[in-house]
């Protein structure tokens, strides 16, 4: 930035010295052509535009080949509005087995960022008491290979797979939940009266903030991910309440 400032000052001084202020103070035969002055002004405008468009905030990042070359300021993850319990930046895959749900990734630690108090996740189903069953069967996993997603405007965007934080490559993970089977039983959802109701299990979605590509810069966007499995009911034709 200092080099750019020095260049601007130098060009400005040259322009001031070369500019003809009046007819009386310019020696005969040494007048600067108007075309040269226009060219100098155009060069200054170009430099100013480049300086104005250069990313300066912590969110902005330049792409230099591969995605892990995108550098992100770790202070960015301390902003509460950018945190999500379903999004994790980590150098290692998060634990997903039931016997590892007591493991935690501390926010700002050596291996992960942007963790919150809701950090314990498991791919296993909730523990039901004897005689209790889930209407739909779901599966939850940490997804670390997401490359594209749909944003809140319905537009397909590119998701950043890796970023550089404190000279370490962190992968972006998403905790997603979806239906294991649309029909856990032959009639549809488990425990539904098939005589009066049609039913099936379907995956629902929500939007979380994630790092995506916006042109040649990294930017936060709300993207859609799978978050739950629910049962959809419809009354069978001819049935009355």
From Swiss-Prot:
<dbReference type="InterPro" id="IPR020408">
    <property type="entry name" value="Nerve_growth_factor-like"/>
</dbReference>
<keyword id="KW-0732">Signal</keyword>
<feature type="signal peptide">
    <location>
        <begin position="1"/>
        <end position="18"/>
    </location>
</feature>
<keyword id="KW-0964">Secreted</keyword>
<dbReference type="GO" id="GO:0008021">
    <property type="term" value="C:synaptic vesicle"/>
</dbReference>
<dbReference type="GO" id="GO:0008083">
    <property type="term" value="F:growth factor activity"/>
</dbReference>
<keyword id="KW-0967">Endosome</keyword>
<dbReference type="GO" id="GO:0031904">
    <property type="term" value="C:endosome lumen"/>
</dbReference>
<keyword id="KW-0339">Growth factor</keyword>
<keyword id="KW-0446">Lipid-binding</keyword>
<comment type="subunit">
    <text>Homodimer. The homodimer interacts with a single NTRK1 chain. The homodimer interacts with a single NGFR chain. The NGF dimer interacts with a single SORCS2 chain (via extracellular domain). The NGF precursor (proNGF) binds to a receptor complex formed by SORT1 and NGFR, which leads to NGF endocytosis. Both mature NGF and the immature NGF precursor (proNGF) interact with SORCS2 and with the heterodimer formed by SORCS2 and NGFR (via extracellular domains). The NGF precursor (proNGF) has much higher affinity for SORCS2 than mature NGF.</text>
</comment>
<dbReference type="GO" id="GO:0050804">
    <property type="term" value="P:modulation of chemical synaptic transmission"/>
</dbReference>
<dbReference type="GO" id="GO:0048812">
    <property type="term" value="P:neuron projection morphogenesis"/>
</dbReference>
<feature type="disulfide bond">
    <location>
        <begin position="179"/>
        <end position="229"/>
    </location>
</feature>
<protein>
    <recommendedName>
        <fullName>Beta-nerve growth factor</fullName>
    </recommendedName>
</protein>
<keyword id="KW-0483">Metalloprotease inhibitor</keyword>
<dbReference type="InterPro" id="IPR019846">
    <property type="entry name" value="Nerve_growth_factor_CS"/>
</dbReference>
<dbReference type="GO" id="GO:0007169">
    <property type="term" value="P:cell surface receptor protein tyrosine kinase signaling pathway"/>
</dbReference>
<dbReference type="GO" id="GO:0008191">
    <property type="term" value="F:metalloendopeptidase inhibitor activity"/>
</dbReference>
<feature type="binding site">
    <location>
        <position position="209"/>
    </location>
    <ligand>
        <name>a 1-acyl-sn-glycero-3-phospho-(1D-myo-inositol)</name>
    </ligand>
</feature>
<keyword id="KW-1015">Disulfide bond</keyword>
<feature type="disulfide bond">
    <location>
        <begin position="189"/>
        <end position="231"/>
    </location>
</feature>
<dbReference type="InterPro" id="IPR002072">
    <property type="entry name" value="Nerve_growth_factor-rel"/>
</dbReference>
<dbReference type="GO" id="GO:0008289">
    <property type="term" value="F:lipid binding"/>
</dbReference>
<dbReference type="GO" id="GO:0005615">
    <property type="term" value="C:extracellular space"/>
</dbReference>
<dbReference type="GO" id="GO:0005163">
    <property type="term" value="F:nerve growth factor receptor binding"/>
</dbReference>
<dbReference type="GO" id="GO:0038180">
    <property type="term" value="P:nerve growth factor signaling pathway"/>
</dbReference>
<feature type="binding site" description="in other chain">
    <location>
        <position position="173"/>
    </location>
    <ligand>
        <name>a 1-acyl-sn-glycero-3-phospho-(1D-myo-inositol)</name>
    </ligand>
</feature>
<dbReference type="InterPro" id="IPR020425">
    <property type="entry name" value="Nerve_growth_factor_bsu"/>
</dbReference>
<dbReference type="InterPro" id="IPR029034">
    <property type="entry name" value="Cystine-knot_cytokine"/>
</dbReference>
<comment type="function">
    <text>Nerve growth factor is important for the development and maintenance of the sympathetic and sensory nervous systems. Extracellular ligand for the NTRK1 and NGFR receptors, activates cellular signaling cascades to regulate neuronal proliferation, differentiation and survival. The immature NGF precursor (proNGF) functions as a ligand for the heterodimeric receptor formed by SORCS2 and NGFR, and activates cellular signaling cascades that lead to inactivation of RAC1 and/or RAC2, reorganization of the actin cytoskeleton and neuronal growth cone collapse.</text>
</comment>
<dbReference type="Pfam" id="PF00243">
    <property type="entry name" value="NGF"/>
</dbReference>
<feature type="binding site">
    <location>
        <position position="209"/>
    </location>
    <ligand>
        <name>a 1-acyl-sn-glycero-3-phospho-L-serine</name>
    </ligand>
</feature>
<dbReference type="GO" id="GO:0043524">
    <property type="term" value="P:negative regulation of neuron apoptotic process"/>
</dbReference>
<dbReference type="GO" id="GO:0030424">
    <property type="term" value="C:axon"/>
</dbReference>
<keyword id="KW-0165">Cleavage on pair of basic residues</keyword>
<dbReference type="GO" id="GO:0030425">
    <property type="term" value="C:dendrite"/>
</dbReference>
<keyword id="KW-0481">Metalloenzyme inhibitor</keyword>
<feature type="glycosylation site" description="N-linked (GlcNAc...) asparagine">
    <location>
        <position position="166"/>
    </location>
</feature>
<feature type="propeptide">
    <location>
        <begin position="19"/>
        <end position="121"/>
    </location>
</feature>
<keyword id="KW-0646">Protease inhibitor</keyword>
<keyword id="KW-0325">Glycoprotein</keyword>
């Amino acid at each position: 930035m200092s080099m750019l400032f020095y260049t601007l000052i130098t060009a400005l001084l040259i322009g001031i010295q070369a500019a003809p202020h009046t007819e009386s103070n310019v020696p005969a035969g040494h007048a600067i052509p108007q075309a040269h002055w226009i060219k100098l002004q155009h060069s200054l405008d170009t430099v100013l535009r480049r300086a104005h468009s250069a990313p300066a905030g912590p969110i902005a990042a330049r792409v230099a080949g591969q995605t892990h070359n995108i550098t992100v300021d770790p202070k960015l993850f301390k902003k509460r509005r950018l945190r999500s319990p379903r999004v994790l930046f980590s150098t290692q895959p998060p634990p997903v087995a039931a016997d590892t749900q007591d493991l935690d990734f501390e926010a700002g630690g050596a291996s992960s960022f942007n963790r919150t108090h809701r950090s314990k996740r498991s791919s296993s189903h909730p523990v039901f008491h004897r005689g209790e069953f889930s209407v739909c069967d779901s599966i939850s996993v940490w997804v670390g290979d997401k490359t594209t997603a749909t944003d809140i405007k319905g537009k397909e965007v590119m998701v950043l797979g890796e970023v550089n934080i404190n000279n370490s490559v962190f992968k972006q993970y998403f905790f997603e939940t979806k239906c294991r089977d649309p029909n856990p039983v032959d009639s549809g959802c488990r425990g539904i009266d098939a005589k009066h109701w049609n039913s099936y299990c379907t995956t629902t979605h929500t939007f979380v903030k994630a790092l995506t590509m916006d042109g040649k810069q990294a930017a936060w966007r709300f993207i859609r991910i799978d978050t739950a499995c629910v049962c959809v009911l419809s009354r069978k034709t001819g049935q009355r309440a």
